[in-house]
Amino acid sequence: MDVNPTLLFLKVPAQNAISTTFPYTGDPPYSHGTGTGYTMDTVNRTHQYSERGRWTKNTETGAPQLNPIDGPLPEDNEPSGYAQTDCVLEAMAFLEESHPGIFENSCIETMEVVQQTRVDKLTQGRQTYDWTLNRNQPAATALANTIEVFRSNGLMANESGRLIDFLKDVMESMDKEEIEITTHFQRKRRVRDNVTKKMVTQRTIGKKKQRLNKRSYLIRALTLNTMTKDAERGKLKRRAIATPGMQIRGFVYFVETLARSICEKLEQSGLPVGGNEKKAKLANVVRKMMTNSQDTEISFTITGDNTKWNENQNPRMFLAVITYITRNQPEWFRNILSIAPIMFSNKMARLGKGYMFESKSMKLRTQISAEMLANIDLKYFNDSTRKKIEKIRPLLIDGTASLSPGMMMGMFNMLSTVLGVSILNLGQKRYTKTTYWWDGLQSSDDFALIVNAPNHAGIQAGVDRFYRTCKLLGINMSKKKSYINRTGTFEFTSFFYRYGFVANFSMELPSFGVSGINESADMSIGVTVIKNNMINNDLGPATAQMALQLFIKDYRYTYRCHRGDTQIQTRRSFEIKKLWEQTRSKAGLLVSDGGPNLYNIRNLHTPEVCLKWELMDEDYQGRLCNPLNPFVSHKEIESVNNAVMMPAHGPAKNMEYDAVATTHSWVPKRNRSILNTSQRGILEDEQMYQRCCNLFERFFPSSSYRRPVGISSMVEAMVSRARIDARIDFESGRIKKEDFTEIMKICSTIEELRRQK
């Protein structure tokens, strides 16, 4: 039977049909090879936008720097980064006038945070540029390496464990004439294998000491490493993103804390909230503009797009903003907040791996590292690459490019949002002093502008004024990519508004299905995604029920765990059938053990083990959840776990799901190939780090574990704790006298060894 597709929409309001326009099926594109070209593009573009600024030279590193601040006012519509300090400060002053006490209060909140934050805050985050090894590392390892180097160079303030004291060490490290670091290197040698009698290459990892003079150290401390951004949809070209080192991270964190505190108090800010809270905040602004425009005014909304937001921002300008916001605060606080923008004004961009050349005729491949680009003959490169290299050469020092203007992606999202909101704030009638006025929403570089005026000419004048005001602050609204509509229909941060925010369910499609973590987590995540979409994305009961059935089917095919009474033959069916036959209460078997599915849309919030617990055979319960069963993983399992969900568009979301530790919550083993590479030394460091932390937690169970305050080391804390516990256990008769004496002896030995060290 043929169905006329328009019939499907008869009962559906037009705006709900947005889910049918979904273009993003299939996998997103990933980048391969080197990111050097993209990074050079970023550096060259950023300098081009500020080309009429003033050139200076950094006295410490010798890096050439371009300063566009207070540069010539733009005469055309090309993007430019010539922010005017006085305009920026005035916008900030008006923002404060409209929100009395906002900066003052945020400073007080931030000061409290600054004094309480522990240095382990910096272990959050994925890849971090590790300046000691000159490449990316997991954040925790990079921090450990930095602290280790600091201590071996006599910088000890970090021992208190407070982030602010670690930052004191960072400041001091920059004054040192030289810094000694430990780096890893690789030795290769050919040896004969005893068993196969063949020659094999054996790699050994060594650690060696290396001295960096002040200039080399400063360059590393100011370096942002670059990578290619992966999985970006809807773009033909890839682009580079930056990851800063540990010296910069702490300072950025405090600046963003202050800016976040300000954003929370601004009704036009789309950060730091998300989800339904964000939608409510935005709907308020729209409602305000629409109620005020009913009779005499017309109202239009621009779905805005800015050209190269962060390449036109400037750290020097952020310094002015911070100086203004903190103007009545204590000196130490102002200093600590001004360091991040100062470091960014002197930043260096690491160019990545360099280029790979291969000769088809001679079957040769060779790597041209970024360090070699400064003086290699350009005849080997194609035209476009040659132009890039010629342009970037004057900026190169040791394989990094001096990049003073521009902010790099994602570094100061909150602070740049404050800047954007300060322009939206200027749209009030008391500032425009005319018949048009505006308001809007800002979330990092994304904005929506709502303009009200008596007639179309007024709307046009309002938009023009907004556009020019933006230019004065180094923000470039793209006339090509922004579009205007009657208020009531616009898009902001992938939320589509049409008389209210429309649920764009298709965005969530990629997160339906089996995640591939393990049987336990996948079941839990799968039903949680369906539950969340019923709550947040207008997923109706019938569709949810269908989604659930499809998910169970998908899950059974993935893990080959079809019901015990099915005819489908898989590798597991022999075991599953055997279990099915010897189980009395078949309803109690988990789906992953060939049991039936008991989920429906009413009980999605219950973990499967809990749902079926009462129905399980006793011996099955005992095998499934017995802590003594070697297959029950208790290593990583908390009662709540986090999964990272990737929607089709927009940022990855963190999603909590219930985790019940069973034989199905296995954790896959680390790939063995890492053990033969230069990463091996790092892996050993990481395991050592992990062991120490686990040991420490044995001594201090979570209930009694307070973060150590004062300067006692972990070892001292554990020894004194062991002594106290041993005495209590001995006096209450839980341990014998000889055990007690033994423990005391071990404690004394440990202390003795520490003294000798």
Swiss-Prot record:
InterPro entries: RNA-dir_pol_NSvirus, RNA_pol_PB1_influenza. GO terms for biological process: DNA-templated transcription; symbiont-mediated suppression of host gene expression; symbiont-mediated suppression of host mRNA transcription via inhibition of RNA polymerase II activity; viral RNA genome replication; viral transcription. Keywords: Eukaryotic host gene expression shutoff by virus, Eukaryotic host transcription shutoff by virus, Host cytoplasm, Host gene expression shutoff by virus, Host nucleus, Host-virus interaction, Inhibition of host RNA polymerase II by virus, Nucleotide-binding, Nucleotidyltransferase, Phosphoprotein, RNA-directed RNA polymerase, Transferase, Viral RNA replication, Viral transcription. Residues 50-82 are annotated as: Disordered. It is an enzyme of class 2 (transferase). It is found in: Host nucleus; Host cytoplasm. It catalyses: RNA(n) + a ribonucleoside 5'-triphosphate = RNA(n+1) + diphosphate. A motif (Nuclear localization signal) lies at residues 187-195, 203-216. Its main location: host cell. RNA-dependent RNA polymerase which is responsible for replication and transcription of virus RNA segments. The transcription of viral mRNAs occurs by a unique mechanism called cap-snatching. 5' methylated caps of cellular mRNAs are cleaved after 10-13 nucleotides by PA. In turn, these short capped RNAs are used as primers by PB1 for transcription of viral mRNAs. During virus replication, PB1 initiates RNA synthesis and copy vRNA into complementary RNA (cRNA) which in turn serves as a template for the production of more vRNAs. Influenza RNA polymerase is composed of three subunits: PB1, PB2 and PA. Interacts (via N-terminus) with PA (via C-terminus). Interacts (via C-terminus) with PB2 (via N-terminus); this interaction is essential for transcription initiation. Interacts (via C-terminus) with human PKP2 (via N-terminus); the interaction competitively inhibits the interaction between the RNA polymerase subunits PB1 and PB2. This is RNA-directed RNA polymerase catalytic subunit. It comes from Influenza A virus (strain A/Beijing/11/1956 H1N1). The gene is PB1.
